[in-house]
Amino acid sequence: YLPEANKSLRELNDKIERKVFENAKQYNTIMEYKAAMVALDNFVSDYPGTPYKEDALFYKYDSAYQLAINSVHEKMEERLNIAKTSYQSLIKFKPDTKHKKLADEMFARIETDLKNFTK
């Protein structure tokens, strides 16, 4: 019975992990970007070996990016820098990420917007 029980336990844990990821990602979908960043951070720390880590890091980056570009001017620079750090985390984890094209386009906008603050 032990191998069967272990298999069932593994399957249930995989389902829970997927559900936690989908719940965290949902915050991004409904444009609750601060909540998405926290939930995705928690997901990555709670499930360090997850197969969803690449996607979690991308959605955290996307949330940080969306929060930054939609911010009031006073908060924009700080949030752009947070988004930049999220991009670097994604690329450090997986340089050839499946989200690379979009991530690079978003990063170019971040760099352009940050230049406005250094003038």
Language-model segment annotations:
Residues 1-119:
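Acidic, polar-rich low-complexity tracts and alpha-helical solenoid repeat scaffolds
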